[in-house]
Amino acid sequence: MPAILGCDGAGVVEAIGSGVQQFRVGDAVYFCHGGLGGHPGNYAEYAIVDERFAAPKPGSIDFAAAAAAPLVLITAWEALYDRGRLEAGRKVLIHAGAGGVGHVAIQLAKLAGATVCTTVSTPEKANFVRQLGADHVILYRETDPIQAVLDWTNGEGVDLTFDTIGGKVLSQSFAQTAVYGDVVTILAPDPQTDWKTARDRNLRVSYELMLTPMLKGMMQAQIDQAKILRQCTRLIDQKELVIHISQTFPLAEAAAAHRSIETGSTMGKLVLLTES
């Protein structure tokens, strides 16, 4: 105590151990490690990170964008490519496409050759996700999101639904997904979740928690996640993937940043900045 929060981080290597081989002092890196499970987090000026869990920072973006990226990149990547087994030509529904995970998921799905439908709350967010490549946008406050998806898919439902909201949205996802389709959620299901539709449709329901390898001490899985970041570095530097920052806060105003997230009005990511 006190606990140091923050899973994501980016910065310049200040010092290395005698066995470090991948990085040198002065290298710019980004990573997702710490903040949970007894590991000190990154709401700080310095962090200690195993070299195997870090990746070179994309050279085309600043440290603010890089610090906001790792958790959402890995989460969206694992959810779509590993859990959802997304392939070219598939139709995918991404809930809350303007959010931190959602806005990355739209781009990764398009890179895989999928057709993307997403849900948002406002016209402003609808414009944002269209710029990211969304093919069909549902304003869920203005229309029935289940019927809207069924209308878009001629009554069949999508091949893969990615739930980034939880609660009743997970239950809605079952009705929006085609028979033998996939539903991936990043949140624990509500105790009142009705699983009958999922069973009747023979859906494969998967969970995605990218923090599991860190919490369980799974070394190889953490190394594999750093490899995902390396691939994302290439995509970002090739201008194929964008990390959108809606607002930055000084580290001393971390509480205000958390309150802003709770409003649900942000698009993309918020970032805490240390003094340079």
Where are these regions (language model features)?
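Glycine-rich beta-strand-centered segment in the early N-terminal region that forms part
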Residues: 1-35
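Short, surface-exposed secondary-structure boundary micro-motifs
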Residues: 16-18, 34-35, 97-98, 188, ...
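Residue-level marker of beta-strand positions
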Residues: 27-28, 46, 91, 111, ...
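Mid-domain Rossmann-like dinucleotide-binding core that forms the NAD(H)/NADP(H) cofactor-binding site
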Residues: 67-143
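C-terminal substrate-binding/catalytic core of Rossmann-like NAD(P)-dependent dehydrogenases/reductases
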Residues: 147, 197-247
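C-terminal capping/lid region of NAD(P)-dependent oxidoreductase domains
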Residues: 233-247, 255-276
